[in-house]
Amino acid sequence: METSNQRLALQDAMVFLGAIASGTEQAIGESANSIAYLAGVNLGKKMSEGVAHTSDILQALDSTREFLAKNDYLWLFEPFKPHDQLSVIQEDEDGTHVMLVFRDCMIRQSLFRFGHTQKGSLCNMMFGFFAGALQNIMGRESSLEIVHAGENACYKKLTIRRPL
């Protein structure tokens, strides 16, 4: 019974979160994306305090996944190697890249539950979260770009920028 009540409470919170995102985007337009991004950066930095530092991108992602799970955040993601790549990790002049698949995402579920579109302010909050967390863990700037946003999963490109 407790699990059922917890699920109902979570679903109510998801609808509320979707409504806030929709209303904020309508009220202030594109600025909502920047505000949500900065909020995500702050959250990512705060939640990743005390996490061991590493220069290994896969270890940093494992650490991120671990502290998300410890805090009951439902962002299940994993590195993905496209068939035409030799390795999960790719390097170029911009930095280090890893493709990520987000199979279960509380942001996506909130948006669907409310009936709001993806790629808005809540997705930008996620980008900020990863930027803040990885800045703490790796000491480098990063970006997370949506390649595909779908009903069952999202496909994103994580770039860890080269130090200046």
Where are the regions a protein language model picked out?
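N-terminal accessory segment detector
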Residues: 1-124, 141-155, 161-164
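Mixed-charge, glycine-accented linear interaction segment located at domain edges/termini
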Residues: 123, 130-133
